[in-house]
Amino acid sequence: MRVLGIETSCDETGIAIYDDKAGLLANQLYSQIKLHADYGGVVPELASRDHIRKTVPLIQAALKEANLTAKDIDAVAYTAGPGLVGALLVGATIGRSLAFAWDVPAIPVHHMEGHLLAPMLEEKTPDFPFVALLVSGGHTQLISVTGIGEYTLLGESIDDAAGEAFDKTAKLLGLDYPGGPVLSKMAQQGVEGRFVFPRPMTDRPGLDFSFSGLKTFAANTIRQNDDSEQTRADIARAFEDAVVDTLAIKCRRALEQTGFKRLVMAGGVSANRTLRAKMAMIMEQLGGEVFYARPELCTDNGAMIALAGMIRFKGGTEGPLGVTVRPRWPLAELPALADK
């Protein structure tokens, strides 16, 4: 069985084809970074228009990559939310239209469930139950996962997401959009301990996060110091260490609270090398395992949507005939699959 996956929730157009026996057959991705760089962030209208231009050509490219035709596709999965409403509507409309034209089922997929399941595209996959850290530009959440659709929110950011804090702090340091990955690269040249940032909300019980204060702390630190390359690198190092430590402390609490021995990291920030090294160390101390997707499958992509669509379709999920998207869609509202 083969599923075509369509991802258009924000500023990446991702198309992939997943086979339940052969695995990932095609993975096409177009990023709009250059389009939005001059604005310092994603412009929703521009994002939607670019998805319109790129989605169908990428579908054609994916079919060519997999050496398949439309007749070889058994279902079409598309991101139905959460995300930018205009961008979501592009992918959902094209996905639903293709499914109708090809006479195959259309499967609406939750974007964050796609991220959560992305590590299952790797050879080493997690068994249930596990704690999931979903960490990206729009979300920072800790989830208890006991099966597909069996998600319990343990904690989340009460303000900025971790990825958003990375990008905003990078902008304060004068780095180009999107600055998060550039900040992380700069942090590698920083001196540990020259600056010490707080670890927000780690001095109290609970599993919620807060990262907006780190951005303010960074702004004050930048203003009070010289603008040399080394100082900027030292500030980047201090900021990254604070975010990573905060995430690690909360993950450890979640694992101890649930008693689970497996941690799944997903979302764009999960590609961060410092975060991966920190979590690997913690899981070794706890006698557990950490799982994550390869870096290119941590950011938005069609492969995770194709896989999630495959799993949901096998569990009996099929979308309505109309086109429906949900810009806001709590993960906990997803139905559980009867067969895990």
UniProtKB/Swiss-Prot annotation:
The organism of origin for this protein: Proteus mirabilis (strain HI4320)
InterPro entries named in the record: ATPase_NBD (IPR043129), Gcp-like_dom (IPR000905), KAE1/TsaD (IPR017861), Peptidase_M22_CS (IPR017860), TsaD (IPR022450)
Main subcellular location: cytoplasm
Cofactor(s) listed in the protein's UniProt record: Fe(2+)
Pfam families (alphabetical): TsaD
Protein name, as recorded: tRNA N6-adenosine threonylcarbamoyltransferase
Gene3D superfamilies to which the protein is assigned, alphabetical: 3.30.420.40
Broad EC category: transferase
